[in-house]
């Protein structure tokens, strides 16, 4: 089996693709993969690190407002399509899979022009422009949230969940080694992170909250994002139980040892939380398309699996209050979170791949 797969920009588009690749490798030891991304996206780091063949193209996302930048984007899109036609003629993929981000646009579009079967995976409750555009000719559109089908009229949609959740469940974890790696004692771990790029608002609130967090019987593992690490390290007061890191590469292992998560409400994060049955405090990013992170979070909040703190209300004080409340309700929230998960999402997406090839 040969697959070409594309998704990039943030971990939310990349991790589901990598999880699918691992599942297909187990089923098809002779699997050949070509991953297409951009050289400046996070995929240029994560994909080769996972041992997956990677090739970059130059492309940019469309601006939603009128902009001369869109002329340049159209040029790069057409140039990428010409190059991808040659790549696909040489590689001969059985199927092309797009997991979102603007880089997947020319890849899936080219496959559709060549008559190669295509599958889209939409991680968010509200789709981005790329997947909405491509869905009209896609053979299958795999969804992560109930109710998202209304955004894909006429498409062949399947509700499967997010493969990232399956990946974290399958990770074998030695908790003692994880705690030793991050220098954590046996107190419950509260993980704070703002997604693959970090989040300034969360960083500010945590720095403000550190004196109060130091008094709680917990370990706080605080992941700033690489861009923010130096600034946060200088601002943060010292604390024996607050441990600051720029990035975590093996998030599944860390999550498996965690008692409470404080994070944005990106799609991969939601899938990880529900797969593992983790309670959470969600701070949706107000800067994303159509406020989709708030809608991602709503399913958890409405079912008692998470607490919601709007970014404009996030301070050190409100953060500590939410942590205290979540720790008191941890068992109930964990059970509610687990009930919302799709533990077999990666297998379900692999089934779709095999289905369209047959």
UniProtKB/Swiss-Prot annotation:
Pathway: Cell wall biogenesis; peptidoglycan biosynthesis. It is a peripheral membrane protein. One of its GO terms (biological process) is peptidoglycan biosynthetic process. This is UDP-N-acetylglucosamine--N-acetylmuramyl-(pentapeptide) pyrophosphoryl-undecaprenol N-acetylglucosamine transferase. SUPFAM superfamilies: UDP-Glycosyltransferase/glycogen phosphorylase (SSF53756). It is found in: Cell membrane. It catalyses: di-trans,octa-cis-undecaprenyl diphospho-N-acetyl-alpha-D-muramoyl-L-alanyl-D-glutamyl-meso-2,6-diaminopimeloyl-D-alanyl-D-alanine + UDP-N-acetyl-alpha-D-glucosamine = di-trans,octa-cis-undecaprenyl diphospho-[N-acetyl-alpha-D-glucosaminyl-(1->4)]-N-acetyl-alpha-D-muramoyl-L-alanyl-D-glutamyl-meso-2,6-diaminopimeloyl-D-alanyl-D-alanine + UDP + H(+). InterPro entries: GlcNAc_MurG (IPR006009), Glyco_trans_28_C (IPR007235), GlycoTrans_28_N (IPR004276). The gene is murG. It comes from Exiguobacterium sp. (strain ATCC BAA-1283 / AT1b). UDP-N-acetyl-alpha-D-glucosamine binds at residues 10-12, 124, 196, 293. The keyword Transferase applies. GO terms for molecular function: UDP-N-acetyl-D-glucosamine:N-acetylmuramoyl-L-alanyl-D-glutamyl-meso-2,6-diaminopimelyl-D-alanyl-D-alanine-diphosphoundecaprenol 4-beta-N-acetylglucosaminlytransferase activity; undecaprenyldiphospho-muramoylpentapeptide beta-N-acetylglucosaminyltransferase activity. Cell wall formation. Catalyzes the transfer of a GlcNAc subunit on undecaprenyl-pyrophosphoryl-MurNAc-pentapeptide (lipid intermediate I) to form undecaprenyl-pyrophosphoryl-MurNAc-(pentapeptide)GlcNAc (lipid intermediate II).
